[in-house]
């Protein structure tokens, strides 16, 4: 009987313990669910490098019978323009770089041209979303008529190792536009953008030099992007130099019509976008587009364009200029252009 009583007491203890554990688990369930919800939201919205949601892309279109790439030349004068909404095509031209070089400005200026149709957002297909496939990528593109050029811009392509090979696989005839800027001012602008989104960031100097005092830290992306010659070496393994146009980010500000004119020539377009389309906004220190007929006001780029840069000590600037000088000179030799950064 004593044994029976002992077993009975043990069962009671287990039942009580089970009840206590169930209560504790129920008490933990709500905060655990909240943690999971918050982590899911963070992964969805905060983590970098995400592809555009597939649901936002139009349904993939079947491959056309003819080659997807049309000539960059304009249609002959007098020929009728194809009627209807047109077709989605792979881009014949890409703005592949560089970040904080002036790529958004160039794209907006080119969109004034009636024979240019450009995707407004950056699809990041050849760096982040390649596994979604070419049909998905083409489905993102705006519809174009025969004789119009499809374009997109994603500045990170220029510094992505796999991008040249992937773009060449899409079409070896792709025209490539690279907007470059003094790598020192580009790095400071890059830092300013990051600082605006991440208050409390270490100083520019602390990030640019190892331990703030040592050699230049090329592991920091703001520094590494400016090694233009190294990145171009990778691209020239797949495309000849004749497929590139290098646009000066500085001249895009001081002479937008001149630089956009060079781009129109490169694409085989008539020079439709000219100096009559621009005016200089002294407040922003940046060119803006004059208002179109029927429009209430001129168009300037977003408020982030022309944001003031943080003050960087002159000694830091000089050290970076000295670091970039040999890379700049090699880039001048490779492109046949002197951008005047030294």
Curated annotation (Swiss-Prot):
Positions with a binding annotation for 3'-phosphoadenylyl sulfate: 100-104, 181, 189, 305-309
Any one GO molecular function term: [heparan sulfate]-glucosamine 3-sulfotransferase activity
Disulfide bond sites: 288-300
Enzyme class of the recorded protein, top EC level: transferase
GO terms under cellular component: Golgi membrane
Tissue spec: Expressed in liver and kidney, followed by heart, brain, lung and testis.
Residues bearing carbohydrate: 281
Presence of keyword Zinc-finger: no
EC number of this enzyme: 2.8.2.23
Pfam families: Sulfotransfer_1
Keyword Ribonucleoprotein: no
Protein task: Sulfotransferase that utilizes 3'-phospho-5'-adenylyl sulfate (PAPS) to catalyze the transfer of a sulfo group to heparan sulfate. Unlike 3-OST-1, does not convert non-anticoagulant heparan sulfate to anticoagulant heparan sulfate.
Identification of the protein by name: Heparan sulfate glucosamine 3-O-sulfotransferase 6
Organism: Mus musculus
Lineage, uppermost ranks: Eukaryota, Metazoa, Chordata, Craniata, Vertebrata
